[in-house]
Amino acid sequence: MYQSLMTVRETQIAIKEVKTFFEDQLAKRLELFRVSAPLFVTKKSGLNDHLNGVERPIEFDMLHSGEELEIVHSLAKWKRFALHEYGYEAGEGLYTNMNAIRRDEELDATHSIYVDQWDWEKIVQKEWRTVDYLQKTVLTIYGIFKDLEDHLFEKYPFLGKYLPEEIVFVTSQELEDKYPELTPKDREHAIAKEHGAVFIIGIGDALRSGEKHDGRAADYDDWKLNGDILFWHPVLQSSFELSSMGIRVDSKSLDEQLTKTGEDFKREYDFHKGILEDVLPLTIGGGIGQSRMCMYFLRKAHIGEVQSSVWPDDLREACKKENIHLF
């Protein structure tokens, strides 16, 4: 039966260790400046992240003006707008401590309706919009993960070390070709188990089979220049997503992707106009789950062991039977 390697109190102390180390290194190595982040945005701005395009944001109106507002799902689009508003230049970027509510999240060991992540975004030049630049950025982030594991091992040697020396890059099409009989999720399990750490490139568009590896909203990632960082989780014995990131859409790719998803109405939103008219800067960015990080590096079996959220009674009871104690 599962046994946590730390008490609740020890876990809380270690969570701070994980977050502080990673935040400092992320800012330093990607040359990012921390900024304040909104909890909600106006609906008409189009700045909310609609994730896979079907999740419902929490909506409410403001008494003063009656304007409709939405709790953010993430800050994928807001960050790009902020870079423009704050006058950042190519090579410069920002990051935020993002908190969000995703009401339609399917709850399980790795998913909660409460989301906390380091949301970051950086301005790039046109010639940087390549797979090579994407991979270079992934390698930088993976280097932080490796150093974090080493740092924790010095303080908590019982946590062990599991990350391989290098992260492997593979496209979603290569995965389908390699494992045609498996579902996309099972392909992730297979490749993560084989290598320990992988980055899957190209998520959102249809593969040769006609199926998508996974859904992605049409208006933030360029589907050819994005991907997910996956590790093999030693406790769960499954693939485990730490980050979704990518080079963002330019006017050409946004135009194509909105047409593919039948979302031409979004062309009238301020944010989308800013991209289509080449007003907003070209960027790369992503979200790195804070609770996901803590869950992986502290070898936890459930995300509720590293964050406070709301869980149905039957789920809490099932966890208790497995010796999993949720915050």
UniProtKB/Swiss-Prot annotation:
Disulfide bond recorded as keyword: no
Alphabetized UniProt keyword annotations: Amino-acid biosynthesis, Asparagine biosynthesis, ATP-binding, Cytoplasm, Ligase, Nucleotide-binding
Superkingdom per UniProt: Bacteria
Intracellular or extracellular location(s): Cytoplasm
Reaction(s) catalysed by this chain's protein: L-aspartate + NH4(+) + ATP = L-asparagine + AMP + diphosphate + H(+)
Pathway: Amino-acid biosynthesis; L-asparagine biosynthesis; L-asparagine from L-aspartate (ammonia route): step 1/1
GO terms assigned for molecular function: aspartate-ammonia ligase activity; ATP binding; catalytic activity, acting on a protein; transferase activity
EC number assigned by the record: 6.3.1.1
One cellular-component annotation, GO: cytosol
Top-level EC class: ligase
A biological-process GO annotation: L-asparagine biosynthetic process
Family, similarity comment: Belongs to the class-II aminoacyl-tRNA synthetase family. AsnA subfamily.
Name of the molecule in the record: Aspartate--ammonia ligase
Organism: Bacillus anthracis
Gene it is expressed from: asnA
